[in-house]
Each structure stands twice: as C-alpha cells, then as structure tokens.
Amino acid sequence: MLQDTWALKAQREGYRSRAVYKLEEILVKVKYNNQSCKVLDIGCAPGGWSDYLIKKYPKSSLYGIDLLDIKPVKGLKFFREDICNIDNITEIHDKKGSFDLVISDLAPNLSGIRDVDEINVHELNLETLRVANSYLN
C-alpha cells in the first residue's frame, strides 16, 4: 500500500493519523495556546486529534465522542455514541457551556450517491455546529 508523505510523517512521529497536521495548522493560524483547556472532540476516531492535544496541552481535560471504538488515549474520556445523543451523556452534558475548544473531523459514511452524501454531510455539519454552540463557553 502506498502512503503519502504526511501519513509517513505521522507514523514516524507516533501519531494515529495524518489528520494531526490539519489540527496543528488550525491551532497555529488561530494562535491557540490555552495550556489547561477543556476540549470536546466530536467524531474523535481514530483518536489522533485527542492524542495530539493531550501531548501538546497535558494539563487539559479531553472528552471524545464517536460511533466507532478507538484504542484508548491516555487522558481522554471517550464515549461511544452518536453525536445526536450527546445530550444524554451525563458526564458531557453536565459541562455544557464550559468547553474552551470544540473540534471535529467528523464525516458520515458515504454511499456513493452524490445527492444522498451531500445531504448527510450537510445534516452532520449542522448537528456539529449545534453541539459546538451549546457546549462552548
């Protein structure tokens, strides 16, 4: 299997996926440097973004939600659940309005039918925005 440069770099540096470099770029652009933040990672599988944030900001509290299971990330409180049910997760719901950062690299399963996929992506984006607006401080 061929791997691109970013995937190889991630592997060499011990990250779960190359997606960490997207997050790193975003954090640099917005000059984010809260050393002890409370983070909600929506659609956190395979755990790469959470793993990166725990390493970069070890005093932070991280909460992750995804339909897929992930290998444990030390310091991440993980919940295997649909984002649409996030309000039913007491440990996250009790912190509503107190998160410093909400991140998401969420994507739906694609059907290959463009019209269906576009609607699913749109609906998932709207739900992600709803959650972010509700849970950010």
Descriptions of predicted regions:
Residues V30, Y57, H93-K96:
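Active-site catalytic pocket residues across diverse enzymes, especially alpha/beta-hydrolases
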Residues L23, G43, V102:
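Residue-level signature of catalytic and energy-coupling elements of molecular machines
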Residues S61-D66:
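Conserved SAM-binding motif I beta-strand of class I
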Residues Q35-A45:
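Conserved class I S-adenosyl-L-methionine
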Residues M1-N34:
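Class I SAM-dependent methyltransferase Rossmann-like catalytic core
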Residues P46-P58:
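Conserved SAM-binding loop of SAM-dependent methyltransferases across substrates and taxa
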Residues G97-N137:
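Mobile active-site "lid"/loop adjacent to the S-adenosyl-L-methionine
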Residues L67-N109:
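S-adenosyl-L-methionine
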